[in-house]
């Protein structure tokens, strides 16, 4: 999950090579919204300057074009979710995506952890406790700032063996299909209840966990599988799979420009955090590898000298997790966005972060990665106007102008109303 050290940079499909840390990039952070509860992401509908904020506890809030945070939520689904733990929880309202034709059809999609029927309390919190659900809703015909919460159409439902490693970022690609990140099912080491004991869920192609999924929500009931998905027609393979070998893909995003690549940060076990560029049919290694290193699920801190990683793609970025070394960046990587805003020198840079260097205090980190040919170099981001930026970095957001935002919290769990969203601007 987290880390600080030198950086691994890699060509896609090749072994990563290490480089020394680059100098920090100076930025300023401007508060655009506050009084929030664990904001995880912020997205805008196509052609709309409003920004929609996902709060983990089950609400979507609107930040208007002129910067006003509306009191009344756009959507509140708390009664559909399992109750959340207040000190720390990976469940909740996790994702939001607007249909490419939102202006015409008013459709949008959310990802959340629903109650499993018959399990209404926290007494079964650790095993088969919730269903990761992606649902379609529509905006109210009478009020553009309110959703019609009564017309839920469930798209995908995946029962989850543990409370953690949910993933469930959702987003539409440039091809118009909906992509869904799915974690390995939780617990640790891709092992235990709900995991394939022989190879883990990440490498089990008959299983939905540990994958990137790709579906067509415009056809079928409740969806269709695109014919060009890489594993369509393969025996004993889930046809919705677009890519495999992921552990806990915590925040993905499509580049608004360039070649519209899909970036996913993947939280490591104990030692290494990584960022991948997701491609059709790609296998990103878990649990055969953690980052660029051969992984032993029985001895997770002792990496193997070799492994059968044929056909696997190494990350473009890797850094050390603070669980096992002080030469590290943090504990849990948080994926971000490629910058496409007004600052010319930042074009094409990937902004991301880490939740914190420690559980003991708020010590989130911000990073930026720059491509040079086939390799990427990572550097720290220095916040010059807030020298003591003490917050947990929960997520990032992006508006239709390409600006990137930071979701920052002062608590480890979804409680209170003290959290802020910052816009990253030039110093």
Regions from the PLM with identified roles:
Residues 1-8:
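Bacterial N-terminal signal peptides that target proteins for export
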Residues 8-17:
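Bacterial N-terminal signal peptides
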Residues 23-187, 251-254, 260-271, 329-373, ...:
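Acidic, Gly/Ser/Thr-rich repeat motifs that build Ca2+-stabilized beta-propeller blades
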Residues 25-34, 68-87, 136-161, 191, ...:
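Blade-edge beta-strand/turn elements of extracellular beta-propeller
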Residues 62-64, 224, 273-277, 283-301, ...:
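Extended hydrophobic/aromatic segments used for targeting, binding, or gating
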Residues 128-134, 192-214, 218-220, 276-298, ...:
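Predominantly five- to eight-bladed beta-propeller fold
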Residues 230, 236-280:
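Acidic, glycine-rich loop-and-beta core segments that form the ion-binding/anion-interacting portion
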Residues 264-269, 277-339, 343, 347, ...:
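Extracellular protease catalytic domains of secreted zymogens
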């Amino acid at each position: 999950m987290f880390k600080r050290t030198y950086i691994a940079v890699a060509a896609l499909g090749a072994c990563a090579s290490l480089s020394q840390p680059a100098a920090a990039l100076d930025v300023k952070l401007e508060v655009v919204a506050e009084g929030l509860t664990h904001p995880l992401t912020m997205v805008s509908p196509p052609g709309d300057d409003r920004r929609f904020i996902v709060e983990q506890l089950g609400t979507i809030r609107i930040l208007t074009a002129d910067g006003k945070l509306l009191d009344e939520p756009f959507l509140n689904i708390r009664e559909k979710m399992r109750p959340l733990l207040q000190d720390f929880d990976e469940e909740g309202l996790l994702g939001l995506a607007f249909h490419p034709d939102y202006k015409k059809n008013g459709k949008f999609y959310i990802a959340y952890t629903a109650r499993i029927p018959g399990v209404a309390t926290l007494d079964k919190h650790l095993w088969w406790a919730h269903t990761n659900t992606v649902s379609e809703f529509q905006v109210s015909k009478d009020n553009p700032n309110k959703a019609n919460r009564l017309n839920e159409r469930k798209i995908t439902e995946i029962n989850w063996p543990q409370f953690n490693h949910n993933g469930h970022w959702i987003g539409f690609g440039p091809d118009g299909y909906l992509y869904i990140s799915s974690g390995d099912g939780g617990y640790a080491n891709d092992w235990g209840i709900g995991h394939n004991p022989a190879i883990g869920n990440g490498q089990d192609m008959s299983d939905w966990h540990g994958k990137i999924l790709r579906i067509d929500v415009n056809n079928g009931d409740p969806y269709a599988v695109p014919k060009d998905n890489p594993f369509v027609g393969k025996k004993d393979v889930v046809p919705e799979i677009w890519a495999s070998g992921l552990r806990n893909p915590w925040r993905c995003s499509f580049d608004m420009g360039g070649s519209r690549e899909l970036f996913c940060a993947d939280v490591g076990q104990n030692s290494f955090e990584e960022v991948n560029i997701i491609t059709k049919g790609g296998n990103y290694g878990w649990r055969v590898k953690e980052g660029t290193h051969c992984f032993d699920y029985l001895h997770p801190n002792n990496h193997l000298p070799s492994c059968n990683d044929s056909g696997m793609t190494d990350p473009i970025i890797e850094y050390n997790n603070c669980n096992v070394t002080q030469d590290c960046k943090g504990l849990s990587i948080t994926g971000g966005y490629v910058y496409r805003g007004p600052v010319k020198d930042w074009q094409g840079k990937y902004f991301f972060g880490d939740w914190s260097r420690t559980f003991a205090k708020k010590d989130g980190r911000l990073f930026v990665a720059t491509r040079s040919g086939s390799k990427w170099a990572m550097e720290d981001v220095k916040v010059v106007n807030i020298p003591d930026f003490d917050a947990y970095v929960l997520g990032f957001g992006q508006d239709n102008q390409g600006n990137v935002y930071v979701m920052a919290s002062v608590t480890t769990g979804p409680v209170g109303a003290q959290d802020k969203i910052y816009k990253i601007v030039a110093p």
